[in-house]
């Protein structure tokens, strides 16, 4: 994993700070399954006060869009060399259109 413990600590602190009263969060993005699972597993273990869901690729997967509609905020997980700027832009626009705050982006 390219993200070390110190970086995860910072990510967790930022999620807590930016989430405020938002407790139902979606971890999503265009990262491949393996890095998405690593990040979501670590965040689920360390952010137990949140209801975290994970769903990869809200652009083309209807099930993930349904998850998005139920959440208070999202954290994007993007992968160097995999995620494309145009798709990330679509993710940001979709969240904005639905009134769902993007709390941050994790690049793995």
Model-identified regions with their sequence ranges:
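P-loop NTP-binding module
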Residues: 1-108
């Amino acid at each position: 994993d390219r993200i070390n413990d110190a970086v995860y600590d910072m990510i967790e602190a930022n999620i807590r700070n930016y989430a405020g009263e938002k407790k139902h969060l979606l971890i999503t993005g265009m990262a491949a399954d393996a890095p998405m699972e690593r990040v979501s597993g670590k965040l689920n273990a360390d952010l137990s006060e949140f209801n975290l869901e994970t769903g990869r690729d809200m652009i083309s997967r209807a099930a993930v869009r349904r998850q998005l509609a139920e959440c208070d905020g999202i954290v994007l997980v993007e992968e160097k060399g995999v995620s494309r700027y145009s798709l990330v832009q679509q993710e940001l626009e979709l969240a904005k259109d639905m009134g769902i705050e993007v709390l941050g982006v994790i690049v793995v």
